[in-house]
């Protein structure tokens, strides 16, 4: 239950609502939603018809084919018209396909609007299940703005090896072992040499690990070996949040998470409580590079502590 409460608070952070002090050892904080009328959706051209749209929520991948457009993730619904405008500058072809990397609102909030327009939505089986449950659950609706909307439910569930062929490009879907959640998809634009990770990788700040939905720090650390092997020196990586990255950024991120895990494991072995661990500020040196954004040190310490404590 403590993990569920803590994770729900982190989801609120990701959805930029509020965080309860009771959810973790960190102090309460409140983050306001932006002025949507002034929020930009910025286009990063990655070549070969692949673009990254960057804005308030999760990054969107765009593949512009000669007959159709494929999107990866859907942003906040309040930004839907701006997303459409950005896509229209890239291609005049219709948006036909939408792939959800996972179920969190800042990546699937726009699903309903796309679904109503006839876009076919794809996800893992787990992601579809979580979206359905979030729509039906009053608790989830209170924690994030899910509401009953059949058009927002993915209509096709996919697993490893599924490939899209759009505009001469091959797009491979990979359902990775549990990492950020247990339903994560990463997307490989093969000819373009681009990989989109969803929230399995944040570029420049601590990760979110959705433990109640199968997330695990060990799974994230292991995934970065896979991402590194998939990548070459010129591969562009679209993270869930943050700027475009490369494989050396992934390797550096893996090193940071290994260090976090090592320090928390040492505290667990020494018999420290979670509160004692948080009070000791063991990640202050890492905060200088990785802290101060979406995920704060006390939250990360708490979720890693619970995972390692449960494993003992």
What are these regions (language model features)?
Residues 85-165, 182:
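Active-site HxH/HxHxD metal-binding segment of metal-dependent hydrolases
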Residues 21, 26-31, 229-234, 243-312:
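Accessory terminal helices/loops
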Residues 26-46:
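Short N-terminal segments immediately surrounding and downstream of signal-peptide cleavage
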Residues 1-6:
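Positively charged n-region of N-terminal signal peptides that target proteins for export
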Residues 9-20:
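Bacterial N-terminal signal peptides
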Residues 68-69, 76-78, 163, 170, ...:
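Metallo-beta-lactamase
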Residues 49, 63, 73, 87, ...:
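Divalent metal-coordination and catalytic microenvironments
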Residues 42-87, 187-189, 194-197:
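Conserved beta-strand hairpin/beta-sheet module of binuclear metal-dependent hydrolase folds
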């Amino acid at each position: 239950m403590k993990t569920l409460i803590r994770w729900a608070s982190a989801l609120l952070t990701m959805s930029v609502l509020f965080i309860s002090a009771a959810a973790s050892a960190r102090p309460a904080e409140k983050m306001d939603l932006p002025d949507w009328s002034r929020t930009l959706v910025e286009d990063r051209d990655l070549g070969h018809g692949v673009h990254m749209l960057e804005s308030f929520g999760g990054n969107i991948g765009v593949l512009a084919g000669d007959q159709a457009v494929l999107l990866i993730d859907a942003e906040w619904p309040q930004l839907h018209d701006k997303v459409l405008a950005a896509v229209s500058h890239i291609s005049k072809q219709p948006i036909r396909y939408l792939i959800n990397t996972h179920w969190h609102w800042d990546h699937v909030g726009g699903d309903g609007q796309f679904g109503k327009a006839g876009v076919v939505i794809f996800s893992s089986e787990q992601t579809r299940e979580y979206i359905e449950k979030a729509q039906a659950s009053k608790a989830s609706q209170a924690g994030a703005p899910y509401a009953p909307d059949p058009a927002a439910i993915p209509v096709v569930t996919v697993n490893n090896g599924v490939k899209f062929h759009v505009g001469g490009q091959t797009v491979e879907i990979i359902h990775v072992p549990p990492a950020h959640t247990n339903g994560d998809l990463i997307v490989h634009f093969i000819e373009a040499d681009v990989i989109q990770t969803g929230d399995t990788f944040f570029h420049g700040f601590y990760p979110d690990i959705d433990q109640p939905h199968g997330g695990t720090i060990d799974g994230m650390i292991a995934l970065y070996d896979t991402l590194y092997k998939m990548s070459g020196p010129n591969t562009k990586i679209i993270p869930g949040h943050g700027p475009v990255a490369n494989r050396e950024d992934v390797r550096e991120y893996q090193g940071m998470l290994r260090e976090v895990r090592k320090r928390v494991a040492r505290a667990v072995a020494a018999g420290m409580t979670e509160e004692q661990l948080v009070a000791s500020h063991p990640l202050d040196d890492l905060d200088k590079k990785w802290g101060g954004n979406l995920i704060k040190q006390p939250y990360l310490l708490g979720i890693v502590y619970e995972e390692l404590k449960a494993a003992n």
